[in-house]
Every structure is written in structure tokens, then in C-alpha cells.
Amino acid sequence: MTNTSLEVIGYVRCDYKEKFGIPRQSGLTDCATAFIEILPPYNQAEAFRGLDEFSHIWLLWDFSKAHKNVFATRSPFRPNNNGLSSVKLLDIIYNKENGCVHGLVLSGADILDGTPVYDIKPYLPYTDSHPEATGGWTDSLDVPELSVRFSDDIAAKLETIFSSTQIEALKEILAQDPRPGYQDEPNRRYGMLYGGYDVRFTIEDGILMVCEVASAHP
């Protein structure tokens, strides 16, 4: 059996600090932004020329903190630690001193902070989009739409911690019910790490109530 090595061209920097709470697929949270820090020697401006003409790109990345298991899902439990995501390209940031690419600004990513990236390719609508495609077992899934609520105190605290864009992204993530499908306990308090903070909440009768926001590094 031949082993193949992949070169890391960059790392993801975002507010998702753990797997719990990351969107189940890319493109589900338009407000959530991420940054790919491009490493030398792959940061040469010539390599990215023309990429800004594309609205979306493909990312090939590493499930560096995942386990291994099955093929018939899009979950991180796979025999090869590779993930594939289509994301919106918002901007390309250049280093003013040397003209090299510092990184890419994205939205709609479903990737953990610190994840290695192996490759970037433009999304081609005329070949990559298939409106007639069937989704197998996912065709019967209902996308959760919870009502997200904050107390006045929590809302005020969030405004001192996060930008308005980060708050909207947090609402989008929570509205999609970040819990695993097997966890549905009305009296349980759940927690997820977001932007360096522990966001705790309860869910009952379709309402997600954020009850606490505390620093993850007291």
C-alpha cells in the first residue's frame, strides 16, 4: 500500500474552537467568517492571480482532530482525514511589505480553528453545480430552525465581546441546533466554545435560550 503525503499550504483561523457547534455543512452560516493564513512558499501573489474573479472556492482540508470510520456520511469519522468544503471568497489579503498573499477571507466555512488546508480550487458553477442531484438519505432531513433568545443582560454582554457580524453568526449557528442528533434533553444545559467564550444554553419547545456567556480562559 502506497502512502501519500500532502503539503499544508495554510491554516484556518476562525471562531470555532471545538467540534461541538460547528455547522454540519459549509454554506449554512453566511455571517460566519473565517481566515486562511497562507504559508510560504505558497503565498506568492502569482499563484492567486485571477482567483478574486470567483465568488466561491473549494477547500481541501485535514480532519486533524477527528476519528476514523464510515464513507456514506459527510461526518468527520472517515478513514482518510480529508474534508472538502465550498465556501464564499470575500477577499484576498496581501502583505503590503512584500506583496505576498497573507490570507483569504471566507464565509460559510464549517471548519475548526487551526485546521490545516491542503489545497484551494475555484468553484465552477457550470460543472460543480448539479440542481438535478439527489441527496440520498439527506433528502428526508429537516433543517432545524430554533428561535434564539437572549436576556437583556446577555445581549448587552455579547455586544461588549463580539462584533455585530460575530453575534449574527452565533445566532445562525444556534438556530440550527448545534447538539448531536441523539441529545434531546429539555432540562439539560449545553455549552459550546465560540470566539474564546463558553456559550451555555437550554432548548425547549423549539426555543433556544442563551443563559450564560463566560470566558473560556478565566
Could you tell me what each predicted segment is?
Residues 2-8, 77-87, 195:
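Short coil-to-beta-strand transition motifs
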Residues 1-45, 123-172, 181, 188:
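Arg/Lys-rich, positively charged N-terminal/basic patches that mediate binding to nucleic acids
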Residues 87, 185-205, 217:
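Basic/aromatic recognition patch in beta-strand/loop cores that engages polyanionic ligands
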Residues 46-83, 182-186:
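Active-site-adjacent substructure of cysteine-protease-like catalytic cores
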Residues 102-138:
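Flexible glycine-rich active-site/ligand-binding loops centered on an Asp-His dyad
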Residues 17, 91-104, 111:
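Short, conserved beta-turn/loop elements at beta-strand boundaries and strand-helix junctions
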Residues 112, 204-218:
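Enriched for short, Lys/Arg-rich terminal
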